[in-house]
C-alpha cells in the first residue's frame, strides 16, 4: 500500500491498485437486512454505469458513474447520507473531506470534478434509481420516510463477492474506454 494524507490529499498519491478497496467497502455502513451479505461500493458503481449505458449516456458520463464513489476508498469512507447532508460541523467537514478525496481520484484518472451539469444530472439520477432499488432489495423493512424515492429497477440486486465486483468493474472500465489507466498502473 501507499500513503494517504486525508487532510492534504494529492492526486499523484492515488494508485490504481488502491481502487480494489471499493470491492470490499460496504455501502450503508453494513446496515443491510439480515441475510444480505455485504453489498459493496464497487458493485453499486457498476450498476450505476450500466444504467447510464442503458439510457444511452456518452462514455464520459458512464465513466463518471463508474468512478462516482471511488473517493470513498479513502477517509472518511462511505458515509451514510444523513451524515453528509446535515448542518452539524462534523457533517460539513465530512462532506468537504469526501469531496476532496473524490476530486483527487477524478483528477488522477482524467475525469472532471465537480461534474458539469450534463454529467452530474444523469449520474445523480442513476444513483437515485439505485438507491430505490437498494432500499427495496437490501434494507430491512421500515416505516422511516426516506423522502421522494424513484421507481426501482425491475431487476433485483444480489450482492456480489469482492472478486466478482472487481472483475465487473474492470470490464466496465474497458467498455467506457478507460483501460489505459490499467496499462499505465
Give the label of every model feature segment:
Residues 1-185:
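Metal-dependent phosphohydrolase cores
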Amino acid at each position: 500500500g501507499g500513503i494517504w494524507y486525508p487532510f492534504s490529499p494529492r492526486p499523484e498519491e492515488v494508485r490504481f491498485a488502491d481502487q480494489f478497496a471499493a470491492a470490499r467497502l460496504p455501502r450503508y455502513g453494513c446496515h443491510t437486512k439480515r441475510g444480505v451479505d455485504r453489498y459493496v461500493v464497487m458493485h453499486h458503481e457498476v450498476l450505476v454505469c450500466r444504467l447510464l449505458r442503458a439510457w444511452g449516456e456518452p462514455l464520459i458520463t458512464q465513466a463518471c458513474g463508474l468512478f462516482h464513489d471511488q473517493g470513498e476508498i479513502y477517509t472518511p469512507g462511505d458515509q451514510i447520507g444523513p451524515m453528509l447532508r446535515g448542518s452539524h460541523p462534523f457533517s460539513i467537514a465530512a462532506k468537504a473531506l469526501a469531496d476532496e478525496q473524490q476530486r483527487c481520484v477524478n483528477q488522477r484518472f482524467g475525469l472532471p470534478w465537480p461534474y458539469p451539469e450534463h454529467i452530474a444530472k444523469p449520474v445523480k439520477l442513476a444513483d437515485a434509481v439505485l438507491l430505490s432499488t437498494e432500499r427495496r432489495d437490501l434494507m430491512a423493512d421500515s416505516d422511516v420516510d426516506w423522502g421522494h424515492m424513484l421507481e426501482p429497477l425491475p431487476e433485483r440486486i444480489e450482492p456480489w463477492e469482492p472478486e466478482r465486483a472487481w472483475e465487473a468493474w474492470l470490464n466496465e472500465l474497458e467498455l467506457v474506454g478507460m483501460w489505459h489507466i490499467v496499462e499505465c498502473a
